[in-house]
Amino acid sequence: NNLSFNEHDLDYLRSLNLFDEDFIGFLRDFKFTGDIYAVEDGSVMFPGEPIIVVKAPLYQAQLVETAILSIVNFMTLIATKASRVCNAAGGDPVLEFGLRRAQGPEAGLYGAKAAIIGGCTGTSNVLTGKMFGVPVAGTHAHSWVQKFDSELEAFRAYAQTYPDSCLLLIDTYNVLESGIKNALIVFDELRAKGFEPIGVRLDSGDLTYLSKEVRKILDDAGYPNAKITASNDLDEYTIISLKQEGAAIDSWGVGTKLI
């Protein structure tokens, strides 16, 4: 019902010198009177199955055809990829982190929604969360750590801001020599104030080796419930490989190879 042509639209079409005034007048009064039938979001579809059926006069159906195909083709692509990634994760939470690598802001916005449809548990795209009511989640960036004079200072500032949801990115400099050590200092300070940390994130390096080492360190320090999140150009194949290697990873952030 909101498909219509305003006077600015009509003036532009008139300027093309392709349409007579009768047709311009026809478009001025245009209304979509057809019916659209579609499967529910998240439905499993097979090749050759209709996802959307449009029943309308030909001129109305052709006006909406390109827009519908553009939306469906893109979003089913992302939702299918997300489903593959989530299946590879074997029930672990998968977060969508793809906005920075998306093919433009609209692709990031709607791609994040499609990723949720495909099984992701949350997105770092706050606008997607606002517009579509999907869960949002994320961590701080390397630039946050680099802004401060020291990694420890950066971690403390973040923990002070988010004491009840503190998840620290520990690979800005050196995961084992500084990142996890500084994280534990901050975790102990949080615990002394009555808060428990969420965990840490790894975004580079040998994720299998580093996650196993970090898991041991966290457990030995009294944080067996702290989670390890991994990111860094992940896809379903990488996740399967990491799981086969016994990586101690609890959740996955996927972006570049998703959106």
Across the structure, where does each feature detected by a protein language model lie?
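Glycine-rich phosphate-binding active-site loops on the catalytic face of alpha/beta enzymes
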Residues: A248-I259
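Hydrophobic residues within beta-strands of alpha/beta enzymes
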Residues: A137, V200, I228, D250-W252
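Buried, small/hydrophobic-residue-enriched core segments of structured protein domains
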Residues: L18, I24-T33, E40-A221, L234-T238, ...
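N-terminal, Lys/Arg-enriched amphipathic/low-complexity engagement segments
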Residues: N1-D29
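Catalytic cores of alpha/beta
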Residues: L234-A248
